[in-house]
Amino acid sequence: MGDIARQAPDKDTGEDIYQYLLERITNLENRNLELREQFRQMESEKRYVETQKIRYERELRKLKSEIEQLRSPPLVIGTVTDVIDNSRVIVRSSAGPRFLVRTSQLIDPDLLKPGVRCTLNQQSLAIVDVLPTSYDAQIYGMELVESPEETYENIGGLEPQIEEIREAVELPLTKPQLFEKVGISPPKGVLLYGPPGTGKTLLARAVAHQTNAHFLRVVGSELVQKYIGEGARLVRELFDLAKQRAPSIIFIDEIDAIGAHRNDSTTSGDREVQRTLMQLLAEMDGFDNRGDVKIVAATNRIDILDRALLRPGRFDRMIEIPLPDHQGRLAILKIHTQYMNIGEDVNLSEVSRLTEGKNGADLRAICMEAGMFAIRMERDAVNSEDFMKAIDKLALDFDRHHFHTTFGEMFA
């Protein structure tokens, strides 16, 4: 019995040790898991820090490179006048003299052509880089960046004219294969002519909205410059930019400013306008192919345009924009009143009948004046009386302007 009593505590002690070791192992395993998780987190943070370090080092090198570039001396602008071989070129510096210089091996020899602008090292005058073609700032201002909001739906009474201009301008740019199948060349240019206010410029803006081509617009008077050769240079640069941006459309508004009949005038101003016109004729249908560049021009004085400008090959299609008839005026009135709050007593057909001989600009002014009469009377809607007053007011303003114009002509 004594031996059994002595062995019992040993059994209890063994179980306690077993439980203790089991708990200890469990704690160690949990601790191991925690340490593993911490290790993974630290590895992830380490990779993130290394990535950030690489990024900051890259930015540091970039900033150092920019600082070095800013510290480097400026380069001289020159123009290539002749190419001797792949390593030697004759250039004319901006100061005037010409030099035979070396070219960098990093420059493509095909880019070095006579007339190309380049940068020269100040010390050795070696060609460092080739610059893109430079244009007058006025030329870049002619490029339309944002597409106009006007669409063909905003033009009333000109359905045949819209169809013609779409065939001549849009179709060659969007579906050139149709002309290839038939075996004809698409029209090169379109001339819009007609009385003022009939929608010539509006039609051109709709073309710019409808096509994805680059659109360059210029007023004819902008090409008339003070110094000899400046107008011709603007015309040449305008067409060069259009060729680079091809497919493109050039819209020349009021082309009669430079396209009038050539005569024997001896004034320097008239001779400069004629030089600009001759440059325009050469660009429109000269020795060089114009490429995928379409021309749209507008004028209200087709009778004074030079005959050389009107021949086929320059303007293959001349579209007359006439004064609207009754149905055309009604369509224009519906367009201008679609967002107006008009009363039930307004008869647009009657308004169209009373405005015979008016153009689209006059009809827009009538709608605006009718709205102003309604605002003056503190009404929310425009009634028929407002339209009648607007028609009378527009007619009175026209008669007063005509009287002053005639009076000035009589007693000038």
Curated annotation (Swiss-Prot):
One of its GO terms (cellular component) is cytoplasm. Residues 15-73 form a coiled coil. ATP binds at residues 197-202, 336. Keywords: ATP-binding, Chaperone, Coiled coil, Cytoplasm, Nucleotide-binding, Proteasome. It is found in: Cytoplasm. PROSITE patterns: AAA. Its main location: cytoplasm. It holds the Pfam family AAA. GO terms for molecular function: ATP binding; ATP hydrolysis activity. GO terms for biological process: proteasomal protein catabolic process; protein unfolding. Residues 410-412 are annotated as: Docks into pockets in the proteasome alpha-ring to cause gate opening. Belongs to the AAA ATPase family. Homohexamer. The hexameric complex has a two-ring architecture resembling a top hat that caps the 20S proteasome core at one or both ends. Upon ATP-binding, the C-terminus of PAN interacts with the alpha-rings of the proteasome core by binding to the intersubunit pockets. PANTHER family: 26S PROTEASOME REGULATORY SUBUNIT (PTHR23073). HAMAP family: PAN. ATPase which is responsible for recognizing, binding, unfolding and translocation of substrate proteins into the archaeal 20S proteasome core particle. Is essential for opening the gate of the 20S proteasome via an interaction with its C-terminus, thereby allowing substrate entry and access to the site of proteolysis. Thus, the C-termini of the proteasomal ATPase function like a 'key in a lock' to induce gate opening and therefore regulate proteolysis. Consists of three main regions, an N-terminal coiled-coil domain that may assist in substrate recognition, an interdomain involved in PAN hexamerization, and a C-terminal ATPase domain of the AAA type. This is Proteasome-activating nucleotidase. It comes from Methanoculleus marisnigri (strain ATCC 35101 / DSM 1498 / JR1).
